[in-house]
Each structure stands twice: as structure tokens, then as C-alpha cells.
């Protein structure tokens, strides 16, 4: 039996469910999720492998109109995948009408000269008639290879989408070992899990201004716990105060919630230490962006 493989980008506006879809396909969390826009900042690879195929998904930052150097990085990071993949999944939400952001993305996709599958997510939130209207509207704007309605949260139609991708893959090599599920090191995943808890627990002004740096991560020979030292970076003193909370209560809660997820991922007991530091306007400083891990990565 021949083996098939290929690279697939997941593109769309912020908060359409790209990371939820990837996590569902992989059967575990490799991309953090939040109801805050622009949660995903880096391209994240999810490697789906069976005995018949290997689909390398690339989850991308939500495409938006950037206002900072970080925003520029995120949008360019998303569009750069068009040079690297065999197929694009263009994801839109079933419960929102087509907007200017969708039109902007489609203009780029029309020039990409690679197959584009329209994935309409969140079908569990709409009536079938509304879904049909959405399909007709998008089809009137662009010639898609296929249109697949799904619910990434509930898993509806996700197997159908995987089968469709497999049918369209070329015969090829297995690029990664069958037990590898992502290209990112554990340090990156740990930092993202901490950032996810900050997004979940803090106010609206905080999310875009937060970065997490893992200062050290090593096993303690005495306790056999993985000892992690992490710094949460913000842009203003007021944000630092919010994250620390009254008598350190918010920072403690962030640490407790993050530690549980990190222990599940690593399969080890974890001792997590967190600090908060202010780095003014880091989102507009290229050196700071690079220091915090926001640099272009080609696949």
C-alpha cells in the first residue's frame, strides 16, 4: 500500500477555531485556545500520522489588520505558509457573515495557485438554512476545491475533512517519526500554556501585551520534579499589578492552572516558579520580539 504525505495550512481571521480544530485532530492540546483575538502568535505544526498517511498541519496566527510590529510578524507568518504547503484550509465561522477580513484573505489565496478548501466551522451554532446561505455567499466570491462544514469543538465532519485531505495528497515520504506530534520544543509549549492562563484569567487590556519566557527548565535530582522558572513579560506597570493581583493571588492562580496542564503534557510532576517583568513597548521592538521567540520560521 502506498504512503501519502503533505503539508496543509490552516488560515483564517482570529477566533474562527483554527487551534480548536488542530487540537481535535491531534487528540491533545498543542495549540493554546482563548476567546481573546490573536491568541495564536507563532506558526504551530501538528503532525497527524497513521499507517497510510502523514498530514503536517500548520496552524497560523489569525489574519488581522496589524497595529504593531508583533502584529506585522503574525500576519506575515500566516501568509508565508502559502509558500510552504500543498493545500490550504481557509476557515470561516458559520455564525458570522463574510466580512472585509475574509475578502482580504481570499484575494491573497486567489493568487497563491494552490488548492483551497473552504472549511465552515461552528456549524453547531446555526440553522441549516443559514449554513447554506453562507456556503453560497463564499462560493460566489472564489472557486474552492471543496467546501466542508464542520464543528471543530464537537468533531462533526472532521473525519470527512481528513479523508478528503488524504484523497488529495500525493504519494510521498514520512517526514517525521510517527510518535512526533509537533515541531516545537517542550519549552515553547510550556510558555504557551502559561500565556493561555494569563489570557483566560485577566482583563481585556492584558492579552496582547503578554509574552512568556522560560528562563530554565530542568529536573531536580532530589525531588524528581521538573523545575521550571518562567517570566511573564508585560508593557506597563499597571499590567504587572493586574497579573500579580492582590497579595499575589492572580499570579498564584495562573501558576496553579498552568502547572496542571504542563504536568499532563510532560507526564511528570512540576514545580513552577513565575515572575512578572515590565518591558515597555516590546511589541514594537524587533530585538525584543526575537528575544521572546517571535521570528520567522520556514518549514
Swiss-Prot record:
Residues 4-171 form the Era-type G domain. Signal peptide: none annotated. The keyword Ligase does not apply. It is a peripheral membrane protein. GO terms for molecular function: GTP binding; GTPase activity; ribosomal small subunit binding; small ribosomal subunit rRNA binding. Residues 38-42 are annotated as: G2. SUPFAM superfamilies: P-loop containing nucleoside triphosphate hydrolases (SSF52540), Prokaryotic type KH domain (KH-domain type II) (SSF54814). InterPro entries: G_ERA_dom (IPR030388), GTP-bd (IPR006073), GTPase_Era-like (IPR005662), KH_dom-like_a/b (IPR015946), KH_dom_type_2 (IPR004044), KH_sf_prok-type (IPR009019), P-loop_NTPase (IPR027417), Small_GTP-bd (IPR005225). It comes from the Bacteria. Residues 150-152 are annotated as: G5. Residues 202-280 form the KH type-2 domain. Monomer. An essential GTPase that binds both GDP and GTP, with rapid nucleotide exchange. Plays a role in 16S rRNA processing and 30S ribosomal subunit biogenesis and possibly also in cell cycle regulation and energy metabolism. NCBIfam families: era, PRK00089.1, small_GTP. PANTHER family: GTPASE ERA (PTHR42698), GTPASE ERA, MITOCHONDRIAL (PTHR42698:SF1). This is GTPase Era. It comes from Streptococcus uberis (strain ATCC BAA-854 / 0140J). The gene is era.
